[in-house]
UniProtKB/Swiss-Prot annotation:
One of its GO terms (molecular function) is mRNA 3'-UTR binding. Binds mRNA and regulates the stability of target mRNA. This is Calcium-regulated heat stable protein 1. Residues 1-12 have a biased composition (Pro residues). It comes from Rattus norvegicus (Rat). It comes from the Eukaryota. Gene3D superfamilies: Nucleic acid-binding proteins. GO terms for biological process: regulation of mRNA stability. Widely expressed. Residues 1-49 are annotated as: Disordered. GO terms for cellular component: cytoplasm; cytoplasmic exosome (RNase complex); cytosol; P granule; P-body. Homodimer. Interacts with STYX. Coiled coil: none annotated.
Protein backbone atom coordinates (compact mmCIF):
# COMPACT_ATOMS: atom_id res chain seq x y z
CA UNK A 1 0.00 0.00 0.00
CA UNK A 2 1.23 3.38 -0.93
CA UNK A 3 0.45 6.47 1.05
CA UNK A 4 0.65 8.68 -2.00
CA UNK A 5 -2.68 9.98 -3.36
CA UNK A 6 -3.48 9.07 -6.97
CA UNK A 7 -2.45 11.70 -9.52
CA UNK A 8 -5.17 14.20 -10.54
CA UNK A 9 -6.88 13.44 -13.86
CA UNK A 10 -5.23 15.11 -16.81
CA UNK A 11 -7.25 16.86 -19.54
CA UNK A 12 -7.13 15.09 -22.91
CA UNK A 13 -4.53 16.40 -25.27
CA UNK A 14 -6.27 15.46 -28.52
CA UNK A 15 -9.92 15.93 -29.70
CA UNK A 16 -10.33 12.30 -30.76
CA UNK A 17 -9.58 11.15 -27.26
CA UNK A 18 -12.74 12.90 -25.99
CA UNK A 19 -14.91 11.75 -28.89
CA UNK A 20 -15.42 15.05 -30.74
CA UNK A 21 -14.49 13.70 -34.13
CA UNK A 22 -15.74 10.17 -33.66
CA UNK A 23 -19.49 10.76 -33.39
CA UNK A 24 -21.12 13.64 -35.25
CA UNK A 25 -24.17 14.88 -33.36
CA UNK A 26 -27.09 16.76 -34.76
CA UNK A 27 -27.65 20.05 -33.03
CA UNK A 28 -30.94 20.27 -31.20
CA UNK A 29 -32.87 23.35 -32.30
CA UNK A 30 -35.87 25.06 -30.91
CA UNK A 31 -38.84 25.40 -33.23
CA UNK A 32 -38.73 28.57 -35.31
CA UNK A 33 -41.70 30.33 -36.87
CA UNK A 34 -39.54 31.12 -39.90
CA UNK A 35 -38.91 27.48 -40.81
CA UNK A 36 -40.73 26.06 -43.80
CA UNK A 37 -40.91 29.45 -45.56
CA UNK A 38 -43.70 30.66 -43.29
CA UNK A 39 -42.93 34.30 -42.69
CA UNK A 40 -45.37 36.23 -40.54
CA UNK A 41 -46.92 39.16 -42.36
CA UNK A 42 -45.70 42.52 -41.05
CA UNK A 43 -49.03 44.03 -42.15
CA UNK A 44 -52.32 43.65 -40.33
CA UNK A 45 -54.42 40.99 -42.02
CA UNK A 46 -58.12 40.42 -41.56
CA UNK A 47 -57.32 38.13 -38.63
CA UNK A 48 -54.94 40.50 -36.86
CA UNK A 49 -56.64 43.82 -37.61
CA UNK A 50 -58.11 45.53 -34.57
CA UNK A 51 -61.86 45.80 -34.22
CA UNK A 52 -61.74 49.61 -34.39
CA UNK A 53 -59.70 49.53 -37.63
CA UNK A 54 -62.19 47.08 -39.13
CA UNK A 55 -65.13 49.32 -38.20
CA UNK A 56 -63.42 52.43 -39.62
CA UNK A 57 -62.67 50.63 -42.89
CA UNK A 58 -66.18 49.19 -43.26
CA UNK A 59 -67.73 52.64 -42.77
CA UNK A 60 -65.50 54.20 -45.42
CA UNK A 61 -66.33 54.85 -49.07
CA UNK A 62 -66.13 52.16 -51.77
CA UNK A 63 -63.44 52.70 -54.40
CA UNK A 64 -62.97 51.17 -57.86
CA UNK A 65 -59.76 49.94 -59.38
CA UNK A 66 -58.00 47.30 -61.45
CA UNK A 67 -55.84 44.48 -60.14
CA UNK A 68 -52.30 45.37 -61.19
CA UNK A 69 -50.80 42.08 -59.99
CA UNK A 70 -51.47 39.33 -57.47
CA UNK A 71 -49.26 36.43 -56.38
CA UNK A 72 -51.22 33.66 -54.71
CA UNK A 73 -48.08 31.95 -53.37
CA UNK A 74 -46.89 35.17 -51.71
CA UNK A 75 -50.41 36.09 -50.64
CA UNK A 76 -50.47 39.67 -51.82
CA UNK A 77 -50.70 42.02 -54.79
CA UNK A 78 -51.56 45.58 -55.78
CA UNK A 79 -54.57 47.48 -57.08
CA UNK A 80 -54.32 50.49 -59.39
CA UNK A 81 -57.03 52.97 -58.32
CA UNK A 82 -59.45 54.04 -61.08
CA UNK A 83 -59.10 57.69 -60.05
CA UNK A 84 -55.28 57.58 -60.20
CA UNK A 85 -52.84 57.81 -57.35
CA UNK A 86 -50.36 55.30 -55.97
CA UNK A 87 -51.03 51.56 -56.10
CA UNK A 88 -52.82 50.09 -53.09
CA UNK A 89 -51.51 46.99 -51.28
CA UNK A 90 -53.84 43.97 -51.27
CA UNK A 91 -53.52 41.02 -48.85
CA UNK A 92 -54.98 37.61 -49.67
CA UNK A 93 -57.15 37.63 -46.53
CA UNK A 94 -59.05 40.70 -47.73
CA UNK A 95 -60.30 39.21 -51.02
CA UNK A 96 -64.02 38.38 -50.95
CA UNK A 97 -65.63 35.83 -53.27
CA UNK A 98 -64.53 32.61 -54.91
CA UNK A 99 -61.90 33.75 -57.44
CA UNK A 100 -58.21 34.52 -57.04
CA UNK A 101 -57.59 37.99 -58.54
CA UNK A 102 -55.47 38.25 -61.68
CA UNK A 103 -54.03 41.19 -63.59
CA UNK A 104 -56.80 43.19 -65.25
CA UNK A 105 -59.69 42.20 -62.98
CA UNK A 106 -61.93 45.12 -62.07
CA UNK A 107 -62.46 45.38 -58.32
CA UNK A 108 -64.19 47.44 -55.68
CA UNK A 109 -62.58 47.93 -52.29
CA UNK A 110 -62.42 50.01 -49.16
CA UNK A 111 -59.23 51.34 -47.61
CA UNK A 112 -57.55 51.00 -44.26
CA UNK A 113 -54.32 52.67 -43.11
CA UNK A 114 -51.30 50.48 -42.38
CA UNK A 115 -49.81 50.86 -38.88
CA UNK A 116 -47.60 51.86 -37.17
CA UNK A 117 -47.19 55.18 -39.00
CA UNK A 118 -50.54 55.02 -40.84
CA UNK A 119 -48.94 56.70 -43.86
CA UNK A 120 -49.73 53.99 -46.43
CA UNK A 121 -53.03 52.38 -47.35
CA UNK A 122 -54.21 48.80 -47.72
CA UNK A 123 -57.25 47.57 -49.67
CA UNK A 124 -59.86 45.72 -47.60
CA UNK A 125 -63.22 44.13 -48.45
CA UNK A 126 -62.00 43.59 -52.03
CA UNK A 127 -64.65 42.26 -54.44
CA UNK A 128 -63.94 41.28 -58.05
CA UNK A 129 -66.68 42.95 -60.10
CA UNK A 130 -65.52 41.96 -63.63
CA UNK A 131 -63.11 39.17 -64.50
CA UNK A 132 -60.40 40.18 -66.97
CA UNK A 133 -61.47 38.85 -70.40
CA UNK A 134 -59.34 36.19 -72.07
CA UNK A 135 -57.61 35.06 -68.89
CA UNK A 136 -57.76 31.91 -66.83
CA UNK A 137 -59.15 32.34 -63.36
CA UNK A 138 -58.62 30.00 -60.47
CA UNK A 139 -60.98 29.49 -57.58
CA UNK A 140 -59.58 29.30 -54.06
CA UNK A 141 -60.27 25.56 -54.13
CA UNK A 142 -58.08 25.15 -57.23
CA UNK A 143 -60.59 24.85 -60.09
CA UNK A 144 -59.60 26.74 -63.25
CA UNK A 145 -62.05 28.49 -65.58
CA UNK A 146 -61.52 30.64 -68.67
CA UNK A 147 -63.20 34.01 -68.94
Amino acid sequence: MSSEPPPPPQPPTHQTSIGLLDTPRARDRSPSPLRGNVVPSPLPTRRTRTFSATVRASQGPVYKGVCKCFCRSKGHGFITPADGGPDIFLHISDVEGEYVPVEGDEVTYKMCSIPPKNEKLQAVEVVITHLAPGTKHETWSGHVISS
